[in-house]
Amino acid sequence: MKLIVGLGNPGAKYAANRHNVGFMAVERIAGDHGFSPWRARFQGEIAEGRLGETRVTLLKPATFMNLSGQSVGEAMRYLKLAPQDVIVLHDELDLAPGKVRLKTGGGHAGHNGLRSLHQHIGEGYRRLRIGIGHPGDKDRVAGYVLSDFAKAEQAGLDDLLRGISDGAAALAAGDDARFMNAVAARVAPARNSGTRPDNPGKGSPEKPAAKPANDPIAEPPSLSDRLRALTERFR
């Protein structure tokens, strides 16, 4: 069994914030994979189901970000799980939007949600770092993470969340390579190989056929050619 935790802040006010991308990811997984309805438990909300062969409990702590470890610790104790059975999905300033990285252990890098987890369960859990980019100035970080994703970012965000959901069974099974491939297939799909599409009426328009090298439109007839043609008509 695995416990997959999405980090964020509860309430409609924060729902679309960059800091809540962990919540967004587990909500997408629950919706796409037929999990049970969300219900209150462990100082948060849980949904239960399966990802491939793995039984999974999804958790959204309702303690606010800075106390996330309280909720996760309670869930772990009840479910009798070790830190290596926990996968935490969280926002990552040091990755560009659309990028994800998997990591086990290590420091919290100033992330308050991870700081709380370290205090309550140690650092041996797995984590999926979901890139949100950096505002460029550390003094702007607090406002940046608590601001909503821009409209221009929505399409890329949706592709990323779909990719995470597509690879969720691999994530739960510990198949990191297959998970990363699933994300990449959504975020950076293979470009057209150059073959003609089955239905050229859809997608990119066909390129016009190339003109032959001796296309008469390319070089209009000279005056002498026109006079010669006129002479031929009256012979």
UniProtKB/Swiss-Prot annotation:
Any single Pfam family the record assigns to this protein: Pept_tRNA_hydro
Chain positions covered by the region annotation Disordered: 188-235
Reaction it catalyzes: an N-acyl-L-alpha-aminoacyl-tRNA + H2O = an N-acyl-L-amino acid + a tRNA + H(+)
PROSITE patterns reported in the protein's UniProt record: PEPT_TRNA_HYDROL_1, PEPT_TRNA_HYDROL_2
The keyword Protein transport belongs to this UniProt entry's keyword annotation: no
Domain of life per record: Bacteria
GO cellular component: cytoplasm
InterPro entries in the record: Pept_tRNA_hydro (IPR001328), Pept_tRNA_hydro_CS (IPR018171), Pept_tRNA_hydro_sf (IPR036416)
Compartment annotation: Cytoplasm
Positions contributing to tRNA binding: 14, 64, 66, 112
Bias type Basic and acidic residues, positions: 225-235
Keywords linked to the UniProt accession: Cytoplasm, Hydrolase, RNA-binding, tRNA-binding
PANTHER family documented for this protein: PEPTIDYL-TRNA HYDROLASE
The protein, known as: Peptidyl-tRNA hydrolase
